[in-house]
């Protein structure tokens, strides 16, 4: 590749395995699970020329404190969560808010979210498009079902839409000390 070119390759484990072991790949950056990160570290251990950056195990929280501008926090949370329809490892997937502003932030997030309608990604006004595939949509609803089984409370539930892998966005909440 020409100097200064960044290539982003997304895919499953077989693609990652080939990239991490290929001698012409001089840098690997990965965001995801500890298990996969461990495999990447092991695969690149004997390649001292290769730079490796691993961001492992996080759930990409937005932390909102009492002195926050709640309108800006709402915009940034929704952008972080819904950019690329939330289909990236770094998508904001949880919000931690102090007790003093939690209810007001929840209200703002819910009011903003119900106004967001998934649409054609080629539409200039599109904020959220479809999921990548029907199987991604099935997995999405499986994860929501699992979240409810683990105690998450649906504040706004997603519903499937017609015309592709579209779903309405959702917010689930968990109260208490442990997010």
Where in the sequence are the language-model features?
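PLP-dependent aminotransferase-like
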Residues: 1-16
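Residues that line or immediately flank small-molecule/substrate-binding pockets and catalytic motifs
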Residues: 10-13, 32, 99
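ALDH superfamily catalytic-core signature
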Residues: 21-22, 27, 34-178
């Amino acid at each position: 590749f020409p100097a200064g070119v960044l290539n982003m390759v997304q895919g499953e484990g077989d693609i990652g395995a080939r990239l991490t072991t290929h001698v012409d790949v001089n840098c690997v950056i990965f965001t995801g699970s500890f298990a996969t990160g461990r495999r990447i570290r092991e695969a690149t251990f004997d390649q001292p020329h290769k730079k490796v950056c691993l961001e492992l195990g996080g759930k990409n929280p937005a932390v909102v404190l009492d002195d926050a501008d709640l309108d800006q926090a709402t915009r940034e949370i929704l952008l972080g969560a819904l950019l690329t329809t939330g289909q990236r490892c770094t998508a904001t997937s949880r919000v931690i808010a102090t007790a003093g502003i939690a209810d007001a932030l929840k209200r703002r997030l819910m009011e903003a979210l119900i106004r967001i309608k998934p649409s054609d990604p080629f539409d200039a006004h599109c904020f959220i498009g479809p999921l990548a595939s029907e199987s991604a949509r099935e997995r999405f609803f499986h994860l929501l079902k699992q979240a409810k089984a683990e105690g998450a409370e649906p504040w706004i539930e997603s519903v499937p839409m017609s015309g592709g892998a579209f779903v309405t966005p959702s917010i689930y909440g968990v109260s208490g000390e442990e997010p």
